[in-house]
Each structure stands twice: as C-alpha cells, then as structure tokens.
A protein has these predicted regions:
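Flexible glycine-/small-residue-enriched beta->alpha junction loops
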Residues: 46-97
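Single conserved hydrophobic/aromatic residue that forms the stacking wall/gate
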Residues: 1-16, 20
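Glycine- and Gly-Pro-enriched alpha-helical subdomains that act as flexible
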Residues: 185-233
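Beta-strand segments within the central parallel beta-sheet cores of soluble alpha/beta enzyme folds
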Residues: 24-29, 53-59, 103-110, 128-133, ...
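Short, well-ordered amphipathic alpha-helical segments that serve as non-catalytic structural scaffolds
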Residues: 14-17, 37, 86-93, 109-114, ...
Length: 286
C-alpha cells in the first residue's frame, strides 16, 4: 500500500534505489506509537532478526479522525465509559490528587518558559532539521510562547464546566515528525558511528482507561526493575505533557524530582502530535 508513511517516505526520499526491498510497517499505540517502534526495532536487533532500523512518527493533529460530531459508539461499551475523552481522564486524575487549576497553570507557564529558554540557548538546534513550506523556512517549533498569565486565568474549562483543565493547560493541536536510527552496537562501532544512547530497558503497562495518563507510573516501575535501577538513579526524565494535570499526577504520585523532568520544556509548549511524540521525547532526551 503505497500511501503508508513507512513505505512511501523512503520511496519519496533520496534513499537507496533498493529501498523497496526493506520491510516497513505501521505501529499504532496512539501517543506512544513511535516509542513502541523503537521498542520493536530494539527487540528485533536483540533477537538477531535485524541489524538496524528507523523508528519514526508523524502526525497532523488537525486531521485526527476521532474528533467528528457523529461518532459511532457501541452502546454497551459507551455505558461503561469506554469512550471517555482524554481530557475527561485528565480531569479524573486532577480530582484524585486535588490538583488545583493554579498548579496546572504554573506548570504550563514553566513548560513554555523552559522551552523558550532552550530555543534561545540553541538546545534544539542539533535535533531539528530545517524544512521549507510555502516558500517559508521552518527552523524551530512554533508552539513555545511568552505566557500571558492574565489571559490564561480568563479561559473557561475545556472538558468539564466545573473542571480545572483549560486549553492553556493542555497540549496544543500541532503537526510534527521525528525519526531516529536504532542499530546493533557492534555494527555501529564498525561503521565508526557515535551512538547517542543505549537502550537498557523498556516496558509498557496497562491502566484503568478512565485514568489514562497514569500509565507512565507502572511502565516506569517495570522498566526500572528490569534494569535494576531506582527512579533516584535517573538524571533526566522526559515525561509527555498531554495535560498539566496528568503530568503533575505522575510526578506527585511517583515522588519524582521536578528538577530532572522536561528541563527544556514539554508537550504543553512544544506540541503533542500523537505519532511523533514517542520518538520526539527520546530525541530530546539525547
């Protein structure tokens, strides 16, 4: 199927002429899709099935199909809140830990400030490729902006009229893409390449779907246990900021050190294009 991005992108690029012989597939784990692609490639390398692979993700959030006004819900599942929206799950987490609107707004403001500082200091320069679009050169993410606290506080709740989450404390609608090469270490050194990081452990975990954003807690615990590490052993953490409330829930419930988390800002400032985000946060962590 030529329109699948993993197949069509290499064909469109200046890749080797025999690129069509390489296997390609689509991975779907929503927000974690391209991170799951990293996991699958590393597993393939560990098993000896592959030497290297490209993990990439792309998303245009303006084209996400689930946002229409006529969704076809299965009535039995709907009664069980299976189709609860992501914003509603974040509201649940905010209520569970009594995370105030003020705390969420402060978190969002800090995300923008850190991202702006990182842009000013050139922290993203080595991870962003300049592209041309409509005769305009794009050299940096457009999301980070100087926060206007007065305007932020004037916003209405976005998902629950009595809730605490607003557009300002949610990740914005955005477009993005990210990619990386995962390779067998011996082969990389043979080719005189300079690996940026080593995958020591990986894990996924399921949670109550009405508390979707709590997933990083059990997944991180599993990954740390497999690696023989504690959260205190980790110097830097990239935590996807789907919502400020969700991020604060994970940080507080897990007892994570805020000084180590998203030091260059997160998705509330940079954006959260679903397919892109998993690999984007790994690239930023490097």
């Amino acid at each position: 199927m030529i329109r699948r991005p993993p197949r069509s992108t290499p064909l469109y690029s200046s890749a080797a002429s025999d690129v069509y012989k390489r296997q390609a597939k689509v991975v779907n784990r929503f927000c974690g899709s391209s991170m799951d692609a990293v996991h699958q490639i590393s597993q393939s390398i560990n098993s000896g099935d592959s030497i290297a692979g490209i993990a990439a993700g792309v998303e245009d959030m303006f084209q996400v199909p689930m946002g229409g006004f006529n969704p076809s819900f299965h009535p039995d599942l709907y009664e069980k809140e299976y189709y609860i929206g992501m914003g509603e799950t974040a509201e649940n987490l905010a209520k569970d830990l009594d995370i105030s609107r003020n705390d969420q707004e402060e978190f969002s403001v800090n995300s923008h400030k850190k991202a702006l500082k990182a842009q000013e200091d050139g922290k993203f320069n080595n991870e962003i490729l300049e592209i041309e679009f409509n005769e305009e050169k794009l050299t940096k993410d457009e999301g980070p902006r100087e926060p206007n606290l007065e305007k932020i506080k004037s916003l209405n709740p976005a998902f629950d009229e009595n809730g605490t989450i607003t557009a300002a404390t949610s990740s914005p609608i955005s477009i993005g893409a990210a990619a990386m090469i995962i390779m067998d270490e011996t082969k990389a050194l043979e080719m005189n390449l300079n690996p940026k990081f080593r995958i020591k452990s990986r894990a996924v975990a399921g949670v109550d779907w009405t508390r979707m954003g709590s997933g990083p807690l059990p997944a991180t615990e599993k990954a740390l246990n497999k690696a023989g590490l504690n959260i205190s052993d980790i110097d830097l953490i990239e935590l996807n900021e789907a919502f400020a409330a969700q991020s604060l829930y994970v940080i507080r419930k897990g007892g994570w050190d805020t000084d180590k988390i998203n030091v260059n800002g997160g998705a509330i400032a940079l954006g959260h294009p679903l397919g892109c985000s998993g690999s984007r946060i790994i690239v930023t962590l490097m």
